[in-house]
């Protein structure tokens, strides 16, 4: 049976798709990148905010057309949209033949084969090191989920409603999977979860993430490796965690820490607490402990009750903090979120104007930071030929996370031609708003051994991501 997959949304959702694809391949089924050639089409959806819901619905309807013109006889919808709108999908989208919630990933084979699913949708699901996975990322890096669910009460967020309570993977399960990935030739592992800094709390571990990172850094590999974690909660960033990042060369000097806002008034309404002053002290401690660290954050503008003064406070905070990377989300008024009932809604035009203003501030900061890198030599992980032009190669510094940060472009090289998956030093020669450009220096390590075989596919072979 040929199955075509479309994975929408965040890396956590992508890992769920990889798990489902892995189970299908383990049972002898074939994956195809051509929806018109698939016997079964699967859309793994996102429903975090309104634009994500719209993209999910549009994609489902697009794939439904392939049931008419192609060979597909079954359309399966999976993921977060199913958890939020299972009943609506069943009644309003007759094109959909089956649904798979976030706790039902193990049912993918049964449903594709027309068998009754054996999975209990009410039992929390979390994959382990023996679960088959087909990697859908480029062959030199992978995402690895270390936890699922969330216990934080953020009023704007609906994730706990369909991902459930926080639960960690077993320590040795994570180590085992990471070891296998590195043995297969993966050069960079990105640890993910709704809140990675809570890792191990439910297992009785104190500073569980720090312990895990230290253990992963000690995995023996034939070549240099990078390990980073994403989605840190600010009040969970302990000194032990910072000391661990500073101690081990394999750990990327990078912290992704969504702060959401800097006004104490807005943060209180978000049920996150803290303030800009508290965050500035934390940022100073991070930079003091880890020289050269890159800090990424994200903010929500237009949250109910956000006044002009609150937004001005956020802008002043960003100018003071000087983040390396920053993302801005416009508030999405989700009908099942606690913030939906709050008063003081901000109009759409004001929200968009605030986003533009905040990004303009960050653009100047990022440009100045990048200019300070010109002339420096840094290690980069080569990604391959640039997607924008085949005249350039693309790479990333360890301070640039995949898919969300800027990139390092290679316009010249010394020695052998760049190869995807190799880590080489690069001399930065140009700086732009979010990207830098440089010359790749001659290699000092053997050519990378990239993973191959039926267990791994490249991201381009997915129908869409």
Curated annotation (Swiss-Prot):
Which reaction is catalysed here? L-aspartate(89)-[ribosomal protein uS12]-hydrogen + (sulfur carrier)-SH + AH2 + 2 S-adenosyl-L-methionine = 3-methylsulfanyl-L-aspartate(89)-[ribosomal protein uS12]-hydrogen + (sulfur carrier)-H + 5'-deoxyadenosine + L-methionine + A + S-adenosyl-L-homocysteine + 2 H(+)
Q: Which residues bind [4Fe-4S] cluster 2?
A: 150, 154, 157
Q: Which UniProt keywords apply?
A: 4Fe-4S, Cytoplasm, Iron, Iron-sulfur, Metal-binding, S-adenosyl-L-methionine, Transferase
Q: Name one GO cellular component term.
A: cytosol
> What EC number(s) would the UniProt record show?
2.8.4.4
Main localization is cytoplasm
Where is the TRAM domain positioned along the sequence? 371-442
The processes (GO biological process) annotated in the record are: tRNA modification
Q: Which cofactor does it need?
A: [4Fe-4S] cluster
Q: Which residues bind [4Fe-4S] cluster 1?
A: 10, 46, 80
Q: Which domain of life is it from?
A: Bacteria
Which InterPro entries does the record cross-reference, listed alphabetically?
Elp3/MiaA/NifB-like_rSAM (IPR006638), Methylthiotransferase (IPR005839), Methylthiotransferase_CS (IPR020612), Methylthiotransferase_N (IPR013848), Methylthiotransferase_N_sf (IPR038135), NA-bd_OB-fold (IPR012340), Ribosomal_uS12_MeSTrfase_RimO (IPR005840), rSAM (IPR007197)
- Cell compartment(s), UniProt: Cytoplasm
Explain how, and how many, cofactor molecules are bound.
Binds 2 [4Fe-4S] clusters. One cluster is coordinated with 3 cysteines and an exchangeable S-adenosyl-L-methionine.
Tell me the GO molecular function terms: 4 iron, 4 sulfur cluster binding; aspartic acid methylthiotransferase activity; metal ion binding; protein methylthiotransferase activity
- Residue ranges constituting the MTTase N-terminal domain according to the UniProt record: 1-117
Q: Which residues form the Radical SAM core domain?
A: 136-369
What does this gene product do? Catalyzes the methylthiolation of an aspartic acid residue of ribosomal protein uS12.
Family label: Belongs to the methylthiotransferase family. RimO subfamily.
- Name of the featured protein: Ribosomal protein uS12 methylthiotransferase RimO
Source species of the chain? Solibacter usitatus (strain Ellin6076)
**Lineage summary:** Bacteria, Pseudomonadati, Acidobacteriota, Terriglobia, Bryobacterales
Gene for this chain: rimO
């Amino acid at each position: 049976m040929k199955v075509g997959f479309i994975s929408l949304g965040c890396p956590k959702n992508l890992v769920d798709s990889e798990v489902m694809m892995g189970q299908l391949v383990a049972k002898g089924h074939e994956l195809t990148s051509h929806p018109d050639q698939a016997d079964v089409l699967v859309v793994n959806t996102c429903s975090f905010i309104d634009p994500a819901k719209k993209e999910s619905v549009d994609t489902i309807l697009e794939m439904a057309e392939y049931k008419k013109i192609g060979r597909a006889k079954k359309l399966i919808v999976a993921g977060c949209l199913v958890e939020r709108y299972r009943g609506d999908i069943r009644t309003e989208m007759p094109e959909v033949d089956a649904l798979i919630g976030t706790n039902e990933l193990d049912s993918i084979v049964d449903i594709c084969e027309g068998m009754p699913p054996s999975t209990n949708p009410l039992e929390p699901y979390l994959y382990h090191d023996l679960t088959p996975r087909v990697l859908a990322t480029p062959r030199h890096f992978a995402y690895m989920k270390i936890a699922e669910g969330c216990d934080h009460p953020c009023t704007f967020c609906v994730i706990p409603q369909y991902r459930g309570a926080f639960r960690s993977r077993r320590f040795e399960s994570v180590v085992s999977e990471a070891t296998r990935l590195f043995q297969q030739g993966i050069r960079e592992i990105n640890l993910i979860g709704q809140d990675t800094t809570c890792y191990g709390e439910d297992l009785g571990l104190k500073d569980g993430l720090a312990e895990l990172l230290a253990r992963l850094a000690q995995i023996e590999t034939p070549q240099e490796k990078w390990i980073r974690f994403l989605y840190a909660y600010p009040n969970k960033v302990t000194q032990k965690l910072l000391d661990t990042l500073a101690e081990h060369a394999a750990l990327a000097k990078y912290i992704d820490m969504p702060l959401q806002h800097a006004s104490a008034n807005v943060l209180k309404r978000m049920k996150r607490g803290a303030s800009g002053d508290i965050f500035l002290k934390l940022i100073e401690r991070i930079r003091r402990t880890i020289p050269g660290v890159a800090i990424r954050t994200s903010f929500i503008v237009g949250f109910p009750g956000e006044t002009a003064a609150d937004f001005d406070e956020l802008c002043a905070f960003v100018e003071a903090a000087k983040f390396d990377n920053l993302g801005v989300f416009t508030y999405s008024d989700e009908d099942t979120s606690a913030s939906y009932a709050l008063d003081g809604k901000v109009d759409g035009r004001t929200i968009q104007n605030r986003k533009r203003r905040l990004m303009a501030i960050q653009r100047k900061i990022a440009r100045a930071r990048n200019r300070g890198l010109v002339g420096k030599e840094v290690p980069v992980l080569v990604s391959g030929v640039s997607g924008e032009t085949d005249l350039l190669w693309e790479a990333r510094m360890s301070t640039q996370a995949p898919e969300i940060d800027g990139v390092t472009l290679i316009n010249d090289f010394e020695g052998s031609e760049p190869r995807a998956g190799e880590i080489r030093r690069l001399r930065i020669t140009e700086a732009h708003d979010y990207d830098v450009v440089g010359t790749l220096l001659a290699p000092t390590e053997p050519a990378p051994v990239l993973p191959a075989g039926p267990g791994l596919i490249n991201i381009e072979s997915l129908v869409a991501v």
